[in-house]
């Protein structure tokens, strides 16, 4: 069984009960059915939010204690716990934010800003954030499916290499379109503190905080990711640039 369905984090969604129903309870029922049917390997696509919030001061690894900070993350962690309790052999993949054709949400909106013709005041943003290209996710999934037995383990999954900062992403995308970066200097602190004062720090963390993921555990097991994030977003821009321009902003 490969369980990919779930309700991802949305800025405008505050109903914790809905996250619990879709992510936790549905997974619990599916795991119970899989155990009853004698399934030998249940692969669960969980989320990095089951382990951490939108920012971290160190590179995340599997040994870090799980400390979700919102309803979506808590529901994912509860689903993981229920899966283990079911007794079905399993592998849990905690995914960094995924990008690819048809993507939505905050990362899509950021990429939309990158493909716009406007100069962007992000030259001095030095935060580094890990992402996961859809092809790298599928590569990791195929690797786990081919394992001779279920690992009964958890793996963090992200693109390889040093994660890009916001300026890196803009440069990579605009270079893929044959354009200059057009990055303007900025006073980062003057952008951050008003959001903190308005208790909107999570929005800042989600776009501008550090969130580095170490996927070395699965790489050590033999997984070979296909490309880094700079290459991935450049390919996405070349193939789906027009679609990115139509992305709607995330809910506030």
List the predicted regions and their residue ranges:
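NAD(P)H-binding glycine-rich loop region in Rossmannoid oxidoreductase-like domains
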Residues: 1-25, 29, 33, 50-51
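Glycine-rich Rossmann NAD(P)(H)-binding loop
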Residues: 100, 122-127, 155-163, 172-178, ...
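Glycine-rich NAD(P)-binding loop of the Rossmann-fold in SDR/ketoreductase-type enzymes
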Residues: 18-29, 66, 70, 74-75, ...
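Active-site Tyr-X1-5-Lys
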Residues: 67-93
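Conserved Rossmann-fold NAD(P)-dependent oxidoreductase catalytic core, especially the SDR/UDP-sugar
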Residues: 28-71, 91
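Flexible, glycine-rich beta-alpha linker
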Residues: 52, 91-109
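Mid/C-terminal beta-alpha module of Rossmann-like enzyme folds, strongest
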Residues: 143-203, 234-237, 243-252
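Substrate-positioning beta->alpha
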Residues: 74, 103-109, 123-146, 152-156
């Amino acid at each position: 069984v490969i369980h990919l369905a779930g309700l991802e984090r949305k800025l405008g969604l505050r109903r914790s009960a809905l996250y619990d129903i879709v992510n936790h309870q549905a997974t619990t029922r599916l795991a119970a059915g899989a155990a009853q049917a004698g399934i030998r390997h249940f692969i669960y696509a969980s989320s990095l939010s089951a382990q951490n919030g939108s920012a971290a001061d160190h590179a995340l690894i599997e040994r870090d204690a799980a400390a979700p900070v919102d309803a979506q993350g808590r529901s994912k962690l509860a689903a993981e716990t229920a899966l283990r309790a079911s007794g079905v052999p399993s592998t849990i993949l905690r995914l960094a934010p995924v990008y690819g054709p048809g993507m939505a949400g905050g990362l899509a909106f950021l990429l939309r800003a990158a493909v716009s013709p406007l100069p962007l005041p992000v030259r001095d943003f030095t935060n580094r954030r890990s992402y996961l290209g859809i092809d790298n996710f599928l590569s990791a999934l195929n690797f786990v499916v081919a394992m001779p037995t279920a690992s009964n383990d958890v793996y963090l999954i992200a693109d390889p290499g040093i994660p890009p900062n916001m300026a890196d992403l803009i440069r990579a995308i605009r270079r893929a379109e044959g354009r200059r970066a057009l990055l303007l200097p900025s006073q980062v602190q003057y952008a951050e503190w008003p959001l903190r004062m308005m208790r909107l720090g999570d929005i800042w963390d989600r776009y501008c905080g550090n969130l580095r993921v170490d996927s070395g555990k699965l790489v050590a097991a033999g997984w070979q990711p296909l490309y880094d994030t700079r290459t991935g977003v450049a390919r996405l821009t070349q193939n789906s640039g027009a679609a990115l321009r139509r992305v709607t902003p995330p809910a506030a």
